Swiss-Prot record:
Pfam families: ATP-synt_ab (PF00006), Rho_N (PF07498), Rho_RNA_bind (PF07497). The keyword ATP-binding applies. This is Transcription termination factor Rho. Keywords: ATP-binding, Helicase, Hydrolase, Nucleotide-binding, RNA-binding, Transcription, Transcription regulation, Transcription termination. Homohexamer. The homohexamer assembles into an open ring structure. The lineage of its organism: Bacteria, Pseudomonadati, Pseudomonadota, Alphaproteobacteria, Rhodobacterales. Facilitates transcription termination by a mechanism that involves Rho binding to the nascent RNA, activation of Rho's RNA-dependent ATPase activity, and release of the mRNA from the DNA template. Residues 52-127 form the Rho RNA-BD domain. GO terms for molecular function: ATP binding; ATP hydrolysis activity; ATP-dependent activity, acting on RNA; helicase activity; RNA binding.
């Protein structure tokens, strides 16, 4: 009974490895099975042999009173390898949707379809006993961000200077609600990848989730390979209901982790597409705004974006979302206008700069962070003010080209500030 097999280990294997394992355990017609069914059969065989089987996932509580553990690999959507959680366990540990749970599972009996959870070993990467006494997310006190997320990476081989420019122009803190305002083809996805890379390198204590809504499948693969964090996606060929379900699960998971005083960062691409998805899903209220947006449609994406906050009691939820503009669609403009004043940090990208192939194509004069004095120390703050005074008379393109040329001459922002003889 001491042998243990984990569901997560099986999910990490390639289909070819799983097939070899299935054949080793003499599972019938394994080659014709899909990956989920194959894992199901392998686990069932192991459970019958007396192995202890471990499973994990993110809880979704259904209206009927029971729940299922959904897996991040399936983007938290229902699948054959979900794990059933009984109402007794939900009550015992007072579990809610979004809780990340690890435990011991048993194989389904004759007329059952799912594995079921028998023992909980961890809740939100914490001891189950500690999880009982946590404060609900809505009752925590929100504050302005006061702890800096450093974007600059000490890597001399990096040619891309967008992380350093963000540190200078629009510093990001833990609990920031940031908006990247971007026309099409201005390099917003690459900018998000750079931010993700910086956070993974400089702040390993942060739990990083990249949420891609309505994006191209090849971009999803690119993100998964380049980002050291959790990448959750719903591509453009999926229905809007699926976009919504994925986004709701991600934000619930993040809230539960913040209740455990964790620092969570969500990078969302893009909030405009999420707004469109909610607009499709929400039942019509009869009041329609310009561009075909229903009056009630943006309530839920606002609640998603508004969840970002720095918590006084410990923990923070940072959301950095991209908003699309100049797409030629009135709906996108309306959605952007609704979100315009809600963030406390804005990075604005400019099409004219991108057309000159200058990257990052940032409009420095329009980008900035509110209450940046809480994030940046006094001497650096004075120097950024001086820098802005120098850049202000220049045009958008000249300003960014001037800044990039100056940054090329120095290895770090600290060195750059030293070279400014003020």
């Amino acid at each position: 009974m001491n042998e243990r097999l984990n569901l997560a280990d099986l999910k990490a294997k390639t289909p070819a490895d799983l097939l070899a394992m299935a054949e080793e355990w003499e599972i019938e017609n394994a080659p014709s099975m899909r990956k989920g069914e194959m894992m199901f059969s392998i686990l069932k065989e192991h459970a019958e042999e007396g192995y202890e089987v471990g499973g994990d996932g993110v809880l979704e509580v259904l209206q009927d009173g029971f729940g299922f553990l959904r897996s991040p690999e399936a983007n938290y959507l229902p699948g054959p390898d979900d794990i059933y959680v009984s109402p007794e366990i939900l009550r015992q540990f007072s579990l809610r949707t979004g809780d990340t749970i690890e435990g011991v599972i048993v194989a389904p009996r004759e007329n059952e379809r799912y594995f079921s959870l028998t023992r909980v070993t961890k809740i939100n990467f914490d001891d189950p006993e500690r999880a009982r006494h946590k404060v609900h997310f809505d009752n925590l006190t929100p504050l302005y961000p006061d702890e800096r997320l450093k974007m600059e990476v000490d890597d001399p081989t990096m040619k891309d200077r967008s992380a350093r420019i963000i540190d200078l122009v629009a510093p990001i803190g833990k609990g920031q609600r940031g908006l990247i305002v971007a026309p099409p083809r201005t390099g917003k996805t690459v900018l998000l990848q750079n931010i993700a890379h910086s956070i993974a390198t400089n702040h390993p204590e942060c739990y990083l989730i990249v949420l891609l809504i309505d994006e191209r499948p090849e971009e999803v693969t690119d993100m998964q390979r380049s980002v050291k964090g959790e990448v959750v996606s719903s591509t453009f060929d999926e229905p809007a209901t699926r976009h919504v379900a994925v986004a709701e699960m991600v934000i619930e998971k993040a809230k539960r982790l913040v209740e455990h005083k964790r620092d969570v960062v969500i990078l969302l691409d893009s909030i405009t597409r999420l707004g469109r998805a909610f607009n499709t899903v929400v039942p019509s209220s009869g009041k329609v705004l310009t561009g075909g947006v229903d009056a009630n449609a943006l309530q839920r994406p606002k609640r998603f974006f508004g969840a970002a906050r720095n918590i006084e009691e410990g923990g923070s939820l940072t959301i950095i979302a991209t908003a699309l503009i100049d797409t030629g669609s009135r709906m996108d403009e309306v959605i952007f206008e609704e979100f315009k004043g809600t963030g406390n940090s804005e990075i604005v990208l400019d099409r004219k700069v991108a057309d000159k192939r200058v990257f990052p194509a940032m409009d420095i004069l329009k980008s900035g962070t509110r209450k940046e004095d809480l994030l940046v120390d006094k001497s650096d703050l004075q120097k950024t003010y001086v820098l802005r005074r120098i850049l202000n008379p220049m045009g958008t393109t000249d300003a960014i080209e001037f800044l990039i040329s100056k940054l090329r001459q120095t290895k770090s922002n600290a060195e750059f500030f030293d070279s400014m003889n003020t």
